[in-house]
């Protein structure tokens, strides 16, 4: 693990524990890795018929139910209006991108060539996400996809440290206000830098909050806020 990621993970643990400090006995969190699966539309595919769509969705939900039953799925649900053809996000409690990819290869929509999985290792606190009360009883939350914009400015030394400190301070403020459930970085050095999961569904409020982040102001990060319908009780 590189030093910068290590500092970020430590800070995330501190901010989540700090947000829980109002409790008599605040929980202690440790960081672990999950696999974030983004199911994306395959370009050029035609819309399936209603009967076929029902069959594929039944297979999709049956697989998710089995994964939840084994403790291999922690969170899942469709996204509304995400960029890049992303239709659904799934958080898997498995140890590697390869394992997650193997599981998703068995997904009904993927087998039919309608969706393709994009898998990222995600660092986050253990024990925040809870088993669903019922897979088909949903509730809305907001997924924040944190990306590095094309042509983002490069900084080093004290300037970069100041931006990172301000970034973490803003995350802590969002957690302390109760808007943010969990946050964490991606394990790889790509365009997708991390994700936020918000219980607050007021996107205008959340847009104002993330806009206060010095790294966003400096053009180093951008955050796409996407409505996400997840099983009730998970967040």
Question: Each predicted region: which residue ranges?
Answer:
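Bacterial N-terminal signal peptides
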Residues: 8-18
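Bacterial N-terminal signal peptides that target proteins for export
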Residues: 1-9
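Sec/Tat signal peptide C-region and signal peptidase I cleavage site
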Residues: 19-23
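Conserved, structured core segments of small domains
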Residues: 24-235
